Amino acid sequence: MTALNHWQPSADIKNHLKRAKIIAKIRQFFTERGLLEVETPVLSEFGVTDLHLSTFSTEFLAPFGEQSKTLWLSTSPEYHMKRLLAAGSGPIFQISKVFRNEEAGNRHNPEFTMLEWYRPHFHMHRLINEVDDLLQQILDCPPAESLSYQFVFQEYVGLDPLSAERSELIEAARKHNFMAEDNEDRDTLLQFLFSEVVEPQIGKERPIAVYHFPSTQAALAQVSPEDQRVAERFEFYYKGLELANGFHELADAQEQRHRFELDNQQRQKCELPTREIDERFLAALEAGMPDASGVALGIDRLMMIALDCEKINDVISFAVDNA
């Protein structure tokens, strides 16, 4: 097919109409609960240090002969939204385009739509309940099940992820066709076993919230004060899709800097370019971000379930190969 006649949208117009109604319902859900809708930049002077995220960049050609500078396309509005929290915004939500320079396929498009919201003074389980409320309202689905990472890992892998020996994890991974080296990183093994063994077996009949991921996978979440082995982080799964990723947010600027530095050390080990640390974000934490929980939810995947579609292309206007 030539570019000349490859002009039709990826999704049917009927799905565009249904999508618009669902977006309106999402906005109504949050405005009725008193959250402020915000807009933040999709271009930033800072990328992200996360080892597992590949970021698009562009060059800003500054006027009047000034030196051009690299700008990064947002992988999430998280840092900017937390700066708003620190400035006193109160509870906020955003529906925005985000970009990840990764695969395109049935469940992925490098440009996609994300719903992200933050709740000052909410603990993790209270936010889990609110995500559950939203899913029930939008998808008309049963209430979510809520189980710990440790429990579901033991249930389906047969090992305790918090205490198993690395050799046991290597053996389990090899049974599932992962070519694990003898010195394989523990988190790599846990992530493989969770994604390949656990995820396909959970959330089939109703959504499931998996909480208390290992503290080594805390990202921007607080470590649990009750059990230092786990982080106050959760993810939602339903019908074979990872839908949402949430945290009881880390507000300690010094600890966050340390984690960013560890990210860059890992990047060097993997022969990946390091990323400049977002000093504006850290300054906001230093100034005092309120205790809060936040979550990011993939709108396009939500639409796939709501519209009973197998491919992400069926719920977005133009996929990357047709943009």
UniProtKB/Swiss-Prot annotation:
Enzyme class: ligase
Protein name: Elongation factor P--(R)-beta-lysine ligase
Protein purpose: With EpmB is involved in the beta-lysylation step of the post-translational modification of translation elongation factor P (EF-P). Catalyzes the ATP-dependent activation of (R)-beta-lysine produced by EpmB, forming a lysyl-adenylate, from which the beta-lysyl moiety is then transferred to the epsilon-amino group of a conserved specific lysine residue in EF-P.
Spans through the membrane: none
Annotated family: Belongs to the class-II aminoacyl-tRNA synthetase family. EpmA subfamily.
Keyword Hydrolase: no
Catalyzed reaction equations: D-beta-lysine + L-lysyl-[protein] + ATP = N(6)-((3R)-3,6-diaminohexanoyl)-L-lysyl-[protein] + AMP + diphosphate + H(+)
A biological-process GO annotation: lysyl-tRNA aminoacylation
Superkingdom as given in the UniProt entry: Bacteria
Alphabetical keyword list: ATP-binding, Ligase, Nucleotide-binding
Species this protein is from: Haemophilus influenzae (strain ATCC 51907 / DSM 11121 / KW20 / Rd)
EC number(s) reported in the record: 6.3.2.-
Annotated InterPro entries: Aa-tRNA-synt_II (IPR004364), aa-tRNA-synth_II (IPR006195), aa-tRNA-synth_II/BPL/LPL (IPR045864), EpmA (IPR004525), Lys-tRNA-synth_II_C (IPR018149)
Gene: epmA
Lineage: Bacteria, Pseudomonadati, Pseudomonadota, Gammaproteobacteria, Pasteurellales
Binding site for substrate: 76-78, 118, 249
Known partners and oligomeric status: Homodimer.
Cellular component terms per the entry's GO annotation: cytoplasm
GO MF assignments: acid-ammonia (or amide) ligase activity; ATP binding; lysine-tRNA ligase activity; tRNA binding
Chain sites annotated for binding ATP: 100-102, 109, 242-243, 298
Record flagged with keyword Nucleotide-binding: yes
